Amino acid sequence: MKIILLDNIDKLGNKGSEVVVRSGYARNFLIPKSKAMLATKKNIEIFKAQQLELQSKAIEAQTQAEFCAKTINRLGSITIKAKSGVEGKLFGSIGSRDIATAITAASGFNISKSQIRLPNHDVLRTIGTYSINIHIYNDIFSKINVIILDEIV
């Protein structure tokens, strides 16, 4: 049975590949799990049209992500004020959510906490300057300095 793969499947092929598999494997596993569809002329045309649309959306998302990275790189650094005690230790900590909120406010781009890559995968607990990586899109990263200052009450 000839099918079109809708997902990457080990030892079978990559997304979009036309492969021949046993009919039971296709009918009982691949097609019900939406991992493949029958390779009819109509389905091939539909799949190719969807692929073209997805490629154009991916190119648009890539250019938007590059613009976002350039904007964040132009910022250079952001400042976050927090209450601290003796020797610069913070009362609490600064996490990825706080940094994402500050970057979103400064740049205008919606940055989520999952895009923030903190050093040592930990929260920031002392006053100082930290270099933070931001994962914007597939292979597009941006770097920004986060300056944590003492909040004077």
UniProtKB/Swiss-Prot annotation:
Its BP terms in the Gene Ontology are: translation
| Pfam families associated with the record | Ribosomal_L9_C, Ribosomal_L9_N
Q: Name one GO molecular function term.
A: structural constituent of ribosome
Taxonomically, the superkingdom here is Bacteria
Q: Which InterPro entries match?
A: Ribosomal_bL9 (IPR000244), Ribosomal_bL9/RNase_H1_N (IPR009027), Ribosomal_bL9_bac/chp (IPR020594), Ribosomal_bL9_C (IPR020069), Ribosomal_bL9_C_sf (IPR036791), Ribosomal_bL9_N (IPR020070), Ribosomal_bL9_N_sf (IPR036935)
Q: Name one GO cellular component term.
A: ribosome
Q: Keyword RNA-binding: yes or no?
A: yes
Note the SUPFAM superfamilies from the entry. L9 N-domain-like, Ribosomal protein L9 C-domain
Q: Which family does it belong to?
A: Belongs to the bacterial ribosomal protein bL9 family.
Which NCBIfam families does UniProt cross-reference here? L9 (TIGR00158)
Would you tell me the protein name for this molecule?
A: Large ribosomal subunit protein bL9
Which organism is this entry from?
Answer: Blochmanniella pennsylvanica (strain BPEN)
